Amino acid sequence: MAMLPPPGPQSFVHFTKQSLALIEQRISEEKAKGHKDEKKDDEEEGPKPSSDLEAGKQLPFIYGDIPPGMVSEPLEDLDPYYADKKTFIVLNKGKAIFRFNATPALYMLSPFSPLRRISIKILVHSLFSMLIMCTILTNCIFMTMSNPPDWTKNVEYTFTGIYTFESLIKILARGFCVGEFTFLRDPWNWLDFVVIVFAYLTEFVNLGNVSALRTFRVLRALKTISVIPGLKTIVGALIQSVKKLSDVMILTVFCLSVFALIGLQLFMGNLKHKCFRKDLEQNETLESIMSTAESEEELKRYFYYLEGSKDALLCGFSTDSGQCPEGYECVTAGRNPDYGYTSFDTFGWAFLALFRLMTQDYWENLYQQTLRAAGKTYMIFFVVVIFLGSFYLINLILAVVAMAYEEQNQANIEEAKQKELEFQQMLDRLKKEQEEAEAIAAAAAEYTSLGRSRIMGLSESSSETSRLSSKSAKERRNRRKKKKQKLSSGEEKGDDEKLSKSGSEESIRKKSFHLGVEGHHRAREKRLSTPNQSPLSIRGSLFSARRSSRTSLFSFKGRGRDLGSETEFADDEHSIFGDNESRRGSLFVPHRPRERRSSNISQASRSPPVLPVNGKMHSAVDCNGVVSLVDGPSALMLPNGQLLPEVIIDKATSDDSGTTNQMRKKRLSSSYFLSEDMLNDPHLRQRAMSRASILTNTVEELEESRQKCPPWWYRFAHTFLIWNCSPYWIKFKKFIYFIVMDPFVDLAITICIVLNTLFMAMEHHPMTDEFKNVLAVGNLVFTGIFAAEMVLKLIAMDPYEYFQVGWNIFDSLIVTLSLVELFLADVEGLSVLRSFRLLRVFKLAKSWPTLNMLIKIIGNSVGALGNLTLVLAIIVFIFAVVGMQLFGKSYKECVCKINENCKLPRWHMNDFFHSFLIVFRVLCGEWIETMWDCMEVAGQTMCLIVYMMVMVIGNLVVLNLFLALLLSSFSSDNLTAIEEDTDANNLQIAVARIKRGINYVKQTLREFILKSFSKKPKGSKDTKRTADPNNKRENYISNRTLAEISKDHNFLKEKDKISGFSSSLDKSFMDENDYQSFIHNPSLTVTVPIAPGESDLENMNTEELSSDSDSDYSKERRNRSSSSECSTVDNPLPGEEEAEAEPINADEPEACFTDGCVRRFPCCQVNIDSGKGKVWWTIRKTCYRIVEHSWFESFIVLMILLSSGALAFEDIYIEKKKTIKIILEYADKIFTYIFILEMLLKWVAYGYKTYFTNAWCWLDFLIVDVSLVTLVANTLGYSDLGPIKSLRTLRALRPLRALSRFEGMRVVVNALIGAIPSIMNVLLVCLIFWLIFSIMGVNLFAGKFYECVNTTDGSRFSVSQVANRSECFALMNVSGNVRWKNLKVNFDNVGLGYLSLLQVATFKGWMDIMYAAVDSVNVNAQPIYEYNLYMYIYFVIFIIFGSFFTLNLFIGVIIDNFNQQKKKLGGQDIFMTEEQKKYYNAMKKLGSKKPQKPIPRPGNKFQGCIFDLVTNQAFDITIMVLICLNMVTMMVEKEGQTDYMSFVLYWINVVFIILFTGECVLKLISLRHYYFTVGWNIFDFVVVILSIVGMFLAEMIEKYFVSPTLFRVIRLARIGRILRLIKGAKGIRTLLFALMMSLPALFNIGLLLFLVMFIYAIFGMSNFAYVKKEAGINDMFNFETFGNSMICLFQITTSAGWDGLLAPILNSAPPDCDPKKVHPGSSVEGDCGNPSVGIFYFVSYIIISFLVVVNMYIAVILENFSVATEESTEPLSEDDFEMFYEVWEKFDPDATQFIEFCKLSDFAAALDPPLLIAKPNKVQLIAMDLPMVSGDRIHCLDILFAFTKRVLGESGEMDSLRSQMEERFMSANPSKVSYEPITTTLKRKQEDVSATIIQRAYRRYRLRQNVKNISSIYIKDGDRDDDLPNKEDIVFDNVNENSSPEKTDATASTISPPSYDSVTKPDQEKYETDKTEKEDKEKDESRK
């Protein structure tokens, strides 16, 4: 930074020939120097270009304005980095920086040539880029034309001309490609170049397929990216995330290939099995028909087709596959389904099928086809693929994209910090120039009394050096004048203005939390708490949550944009408390660098007297938007002269805009202020003006530049929008204000909103006229109410104030629209205006925090997503145009291939709109069906390429980036810190008032009753009197909410009396977080102890709020209820503390009844010391022991499992299986008795109190009740009653009892229960959000989905045949096959609308709804094809907002909840520093390993050679390559290959079998019996044996078992082994590691999901077993048996195909179904469904499984992925330790865990980095000071520990963790102690170590002596003798010091590198002493 020229106007210098000469001179100097300094450069990084002065950025504002003559002129480069590079810059009017190369462009135009200068001027002009932008947009519009008229050709030439002109200008200005900053050096220009070249090519050269080349023109749309500034960065981020995705992509492709191979082997040719007619004519055979048939069409008559399906019915040859109907048999013939594109016949198609499975697009169809053709057992294949492939891989992509985004974000934050620093440095430079002035100011201040006054300490800039302001002094004077006038006029207006600007006293009180009523008192209190702090540091103690935020002049520039978004929807009057340092309107934007405490005004150290001590400026914004900087509150002087601030927590915000007099008076009343006469003191005035004013002016200028409107607008507003005409009016206004602002009015309005919403939701089709009228009147009434509210508010607040509040603007808009709609009600086609009424629903957000938060999150994300949305729009546009250009013609020409009527289908690419819809559909994840059409009409390759690109770029990358952004705006702060507005508080105040009123009425009633019915007891008077004062206080507290107390000053004034409460209040008010948490839950009254884990007031000190005894009692109660007695395995729920003290006698039961019961009914008290009581107590103790026994629990679990299993047998075939039915009936009774017995035992053992306070016990109790009731009913013979039957279905809940018994599931359930409140919240918000769309749908489509159909083939009559309902009914009378039919899922009322929307949001069944909507004409009119085409837009908007945002909110909420619960459970991680974590993790890995005994090398020479070969790494890799080759040959296989090919593949396979057998044999020879000690070897052996057997018995095995080729596929798993050897595969290893880490959690979630599926399957069987077979329900997929139900439910788990299963259940009456239909073998009649049950069943299942469980799965993966990436970035990974031990095995073949010292050097050199210590390494190793044992041996852990320490570096953290580590090792590796050969005593060890040290010392000493002797220098003997003992003493001292057990080694870390002994000894010795003690004990015992 030091190199930067001083910023300001004079830093701009024209670029002249001298400048160029100077640069050349510098370059030559550098070159001369360069030869000398070449070496230096390698080590040090050179200077970097300044990030603020990059080309394309705005000029930093510190440089001020550009002097007039310098705009668009070449200037010398400002960036010192380019001082020796040939560059210059040009600045345009907008201060954008353009950097050019100073070498001649095109070798002839120097920077000074007029042509180049003109080109530069044109290039940098803003109009130039505008022109290009407009051209591109116009061009895009022309590109969307599907059949352009002829004249467009000329337009095309114009475009090309403009682009050519643009490129020419750029080339002339910049040069072509030689040197930096030339035309082709910018990749975006390549795009232009390519576009222009292609434009000329297509024009002048005839290249055949022009349309393909024309599509290149689409790339012009990409140019928008290069023109709009923000887009480049987003595209950068996208490209970054695509790079990051490479690993995931490789892994995905690999996994899909493996699965595709398995699919190929399992299902090859299966999808061609079709049902073929048996009754053929005589000369026809299957072969002859197949050979003669020209096309599929001819074969159609031989195959069996289901109604409405395009493909023939599939069937299979196995028993559990699909069967053919009568008269048909199963054959393999014809083509595959879906135009032949769905199959597993070749590797390619199988891969496509699996990619489709992974993206879950229409996969239910593939699933059903495959299961029908191959058999139901293959469901397992799909389960694995969906869970591993789909959920895991897709979410990994999400995780990676999210991480890339997160990193990008972090980088941006870092950059911002960096800039802040740079600006600070610039400021410091400015300040240095002012120091003299400062000194004068300080001197002048000394004679002014401090207590009375202080001047603004703002001295950022002085008049001499203010480069920040380049405006004239005259302007400044004018502004000052205006300001004075304004202030004085403000004072004249006086009282009039009071009300107008800020409302009543009360509202002001609400707005400014002013706790400093007794300033001195508070100050003294604070002083006591912080006696040693300097005056300036006090602020830190007061505002502990917020470190002092530096007010940087520049901060508004960087963060200005974000400010709006945060409070966009918050009520502006009451923006967030934390930002009370003024918001929006003010210049000083609080920026909080977390760790930095610096005083606000940087000259603090120099002039303390002039400072506002609390380091805070009060900047109020007056009505003009001008910031008046008012000083902070005055300092209070304490007797010792220390300054203390008074605490003002106030807020200046944009809407109570202004330094209104009242506000100022309010402040003056409580704090000393700059008095008027002081300002008149000439000296002071001058000083204040000269210093502060200049800056203030600059500040004002900046402020003005940020004002939303020009100054004249403010003048106008003041004149016309503030109504203060007469005193009567003002009184009236006050009265109105009092009414309108009352909380009750708010409550009333909220109730009106809810009612209005209800009225709107009551619309339906068909409605009676009376009902219509009621709704119409209701609408009028509500419109009236809302209009009245608006008018009254306008009167009360004045338009100026009214329109400053976001909500008011919103209200006024809606009211206006409602009124407009009333007048235009009869105008046809304006019914859409009605939907604007729906927006009223959003007014609820005011008082509903979560809705507010959701809107805010959407608002913020849309803001943040602005650029991304643009990019997405550009991508969609480009692909839509590409599709149209490439495939449009083909759709038209080949339409007959895909549509029998040769009409264009709904999804085509013939025009832009339809093309856009297809691309949008692909983005929604639905690509496969439209792609089949495309491939059929336009050829496979192009379609595949385009679709895959849209899928990967659009869906996987961009949409995941969307999601990542959503998740990031979902940080827990958003969820917990929802800023609430006063209105929210108003509601709560109103509710609190009502509660108080009710309490008051209750109280008076109670007192009245007591008075009238009871005589006063003696002494009551006295007690009452003494209790009274407290009582009053307590009532006050308990009946009011904290929020109110905080607002009630009178209460606070009594603070001395209730110090306990108010001190806690003070605390909470001092801390921002606490304040926030207050607001969240204002309904909590103070005296209630808050249960942990549920409170929002986490940060508040609950102990202070509740009395101690109270909290102790509650703790005790909690502990008792939390641990469940219903199962012995149960632990307390997460978040609850463990009991502090165990009950005294753990094996005794607790009391039966609660204390309350015993008090009321004394008979419940039993004396247990005598008589019957004692017997009873013994019985209870016995029961208690039985129940607590572990076997009892196991038995109950077994019973639960058996009884649940029994339910699975009760399917529709139970009537036919009499024996099973009888067994089940008895079993049912037995289970019921057992469970009743269990319940009774528990009642006796635990007592009712314990039993019924446990949730799990309640569950058991209810389920037992159900069984009991059904049992009794059966006995009495009422089993066929309806209610009893439905009760029986509740038995399906039995498996729920298993929940509390299985640890893993309970963990998940607890996590879920924790998340339920927030999930419900989001669900509610979603419902509100959807309600709007639903009501809108009802308005648009109610009653329009009816159509007249021909019932024989289900086709719709055309409009020419039937135009409307009446015609249809007329036709019905003629023919019986006609029906006027409604779509089952429609918008006839809001409920059905919700169902439709759910189908659209899950993309299942949405096509039918959309088609019906698009075809709809009018109520009772016959639909017309695509009549209402633009209704598609309704669905597009809903999908974006309803589906995209709201459904992903679920993921957000769940992930967020996981994190919060982790915090609550608080593992050790939270308390560890980063450094500690590193060590901890390394040690964790270290501790888990120990050296293995390697397989010994055989003695035999021959075997030895083979052993060397087999154990070589190269051998492993060779085998891996062979495995991969084997896979490739398997991929080549395909269905129906030629005999020759089969023959070749057979022999290739034989070769591979021989090779693998060879490997097996070689290993067996060399490894002998050790071969079977390795798991992989056993696996290989099995595969080889199976392959050999398979070769000979292939036919037989395939018949009875699975095809043996499958095992070869499993071999692929061995590839996992080479990943470790490939250094580049680190990313993939991380991903697999993440999977391994998440497996346990995923298993638990899987279990829970299975349980849910099980219960739903039982329910489904009992409710839907007999529904009509249509849509998704058929002979294979139904609810008839348990297995079938599970198959159906598995597919709905991903929400696939639930619409098909629901459709038949919605049939409720004829003619849809037949209620009298007889089912043979069963007593059930009819095949109608129960719509309400069906809808509830499927919707609840989807919410539970799809939204909750599956999202938990996602949460776990995201979590583990981030953990795994952290692990992979750590310096030492698992692999490094593995590698250490692998090398170790070679040096320690017997696994003694020791190594000789002499081998150590070789060993260290043999390791891989990072542990490697290359030779020469002796010195380093000796320096490590490794402890040795006898025989000069060193233990492996000692070495590993030392090496690890070397990698991680020395640090203090090591010491803090040292003892833990040692214990860990000892427990993980007990062998360490047992292998220690020195087992005698501690002393022995010390001597041993000492001996080695002495030897070393002695050798050294001898060596020195020899040297001395040789050099023949004479030394006296005595000297030498004296020398030795000293040395010895020192050595011994050293040793003792190191190893004495008493001495702690706390100091070790402070002395530079601690010796290893000092790190590890004490613990080791501990273990040794333990060991010796143990041995002594053993000896003693043996003696005995």
UniProtKB/Swiss-Prot annotation:
Intramembrane stretches listed in the entry: 347-363, 915-927, 1393-1403, 1685-1697
Keyword Coiled coil set for record: yes
InterPro entries assigned to the protein according to its UniProt record, in alphabetical order: Ion_trans_dom (IPR005821), IQ_motif_EF-hand-BS (IPR000048), Na_channel_asu (IPR001696), Na_chnl_inactivation_gate (IPR044564), Na_trans_assoc_dom (IPR010526), Na_trans_cytopl (IPR024583), VGCC_Ca_Na (IPR043203), Volt_channel_dom_sf (IPR027359)
Keyword hit for Coiled coil: yes
Gene3D superfamilies in alphabetical order: 1.10.287.70, EF-hand, iswi atpase, Voltage-gated potassium channels. Chain C
Domain called IQ: residue spans: 1887-1916
Composition bias, Basic residues: 474-486
Bias kind Acidic residues: ranges: 1135-1145
GO biological process: action potential propagation; behavioral response to pain; circadian rhythm; detection of mechanical stimulus involved in sensory perception; detection of temperature stimulus involved in sensory perception of pain; inflammatory response; neuronal action potential; post-embryonic development
Highest rank taxon of the organism: Eukaryota
II repeats: 725-988
Cytoplasmic side: 1-125, 173-185, 228-241, 403-744, 796-804, 848-864, 967-1185, 1249-1250, 1303-1315, 1456-1512, 1566-1574, 1626-1638, 1758-1984
Bilayer-crossing regions: 126-145, 151-172, 186-204, 211-227, 242-267, 377-402, 745-761, 771-795, 805-821, 831-847, 865-887, 940-966, 1186-1210, 1223-1248, 1251-1276, 1286-1302, 1316-1340, 1430-1455, 1513-1532, 1544-1565, 1575-1596, 1606-1625, 1639-1661, 1732-1757
Ranges in the topological domain labelled Extracellular: 146-150, 205-210, 268-346, 364-376, 762-770, 822-830, 888-914, 928-939, 1211-1222, 1277-1285, 1341-1392, 1404-1429, 1533-1543, 1597-1605, 1662-1684, 1698-1731
GO cellular component, as recorded: axon terminus; node of Ranvier; plasma membrane; voltage-gated sodium channel complex
Tissues expressing the protein: Expressed strongly in sciatic nerves, with moderate levels in kidney. Not detected in liver, brain and muscle.
Reactions catalysed, as given in the entry: Na(+)(in) = Na(+)(out)
Bias (Polar residues): 1946-1958
Family: Belongs to the sodium channel (TC 1.A.1.10) family. Nav1.7/SCN9A subfamily.
PANTHER family: SODIUM CHANNEL PROTEIN TYPE 9 SUBUNIT ALPHA, VOLTAGE-GATED CATION CHANNEL CALCIUM AND SODIUM
SUBUNIT field: The Nav1.7 voltage-gated sodium channel consists of an ion-conducting alpha subunit SCN9A which is functional on its own regulated by one or more beta-1 (SCN1B), beta-2 (SCN2B), beta-3 (SCN3B) and beta-4 (SCN4B) subunits. SCN1B and SCN3B are non-covalently associated with SCN9A. SCN2B and SCN4B are disulfide-linked to SCN9A. SCN1B regulates channel inactivation. Interacts with NEDD4 and NEDD4L; regulates Nav1.7 activity most probably through ubiquitination and subsequent endocytosis. Interacts with TMEM233; modulates the gating properties of NaV1.7.
Protein name: Sodium channel protein type 9 subunit alpha
